[in-house]
Amino acid sequence: EQAVSQAEAGAQILDVNVGAPGVDEPALMEQVVKALQSVVSLPLQLDSSHADALERGLRVYNGKPIVNSVNGEPEVLEKVLPLCKKYGAAVVGLAIDKKGIQPGAEDRVAIARRIKEAALAAGIPQEDLYIDCLTLTASAQQKDVLATVEALHTCKTELGVRTILGVSNISFGLPCRTYLNTTFLTMAMYAGLDLAIMNPSSEEMMAAVYAYNVLTNRDPQSTRYIERYANRVPASTALAQANQN
């Protein structure tokens, strides 16, 4: 039900995480991948920290999946990258290692560079690697927010890799989260973000994506924007009209 709902809302990829206390994660991953592919045609991102669960999902997947994720730890790279190569999967690389998330952009880029080198050495094409520079919460680490955007931009321009980001983490613990999420999403897209992990049911965030694609010429003749919004009235306009009646 969630998969169908998110697909209808405009999601382009579905993240699949079945980890929970007491469950057989490998078996459940296989079961869920099969079930999802029977009801939606969207690509799936298999999200697990356990290589055995990832392989069970990869084994039954039809098409090209995304593995979420590896990080800068050598033992993780050694376990997961061969699976990605074996099954032809793209892979998300988290800019984190045993030291945790580094506050500065340069340290995160250095980890991303190590991940890129390991992926290429494992035979994974560069275009199949997505780097996640990791979003820190503005409520707790406000001074480090821009470091994520800077690291993302450097990964895009200097490392030449694709990028992915969990956008809504930015607003955790703060009121009116949509305002922060939408603004941060726009900042990240301008810095070179390729994939946003976000709620497709958030009309404000989806509107930001569609509008951004028009303004950056990614949506020629505004075709997709017009298809989505030609017959819609913005919520603020609808509310104003209702108050006048």
Identify the function of each model-found stretch.
Residues 24-62, 117, 149-165:
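Alpha-helix-loop-beta-strand connector modules within alpha/beta enzyme cores
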Residues 6, 47, 57, 131, ...:
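Conserved, mostly hydrophobic/aromatic
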Residues 86-236:
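Catalytic alpha/beta core domains of metabolic enzymes, predominantly
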Residues 7-42, 133-145:
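Glycine-rich, proline-tolerant flexible connector loops at the mouths of alpha/beta enzymes
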